[in-house]
């Protein structure tokens, strides 16, 4: 007679096996930021500064015109999602600037 398991039906029924764990495909890693590309982007940002539209958007964010800044950036970058990401990035930069200024004083 076969070995009996506590469950005859349901999710836990049948022969217990160990799951075969596979590594994710290399083609799935696209879009993930590497250390090197982050370093290069930071270096470029330090050397070149901000584009004129980014400076104007930052001015709008400084005076709490978030919606107007989003509409302005969307017009420049093309899509709503990219605009939201850019607005978030610029507001984080402004917060870091404020933090650095407060630390300096």
From Swiss-Prot:
InterPro entries: Ribosomal_eL36, Ribosomal_eL36_sf
Function field: Component of the large ribosomal subunit. The ribosome is a large ribonucleoprotein complex responsible for the synthesis of proteins in the cell.
The entry's keywords: Cytoplasm, Ribonucleoprotein, Ribosomal protein
Stored PANTHER family: 60S RIBOSOMAL PROTEIN L36
Name of this protein: Large ribosomal subunit protein eL36
GO cellular component terms given for this protein: cytosol; ribonucleoprotein complex; ribosome
Disordered: region residues: 14-36
GO BP term (any one): translation
Complexes and interactors: Component of the large ribosomal subunit.
Disulfide-linked positions: none
Domain of life: Eukaryota
Family that this chain belongs to: Belongs to the eukaryotic ribosomal protein eL36 family.
Gene that encodes it: rpl36
A GO molecular function held by the record: structural constituent of ribosome
Subcellular location: Cytoplasm, Cytosol; Cytoplasm
Pfam entry (one): Ribosomal_L36e
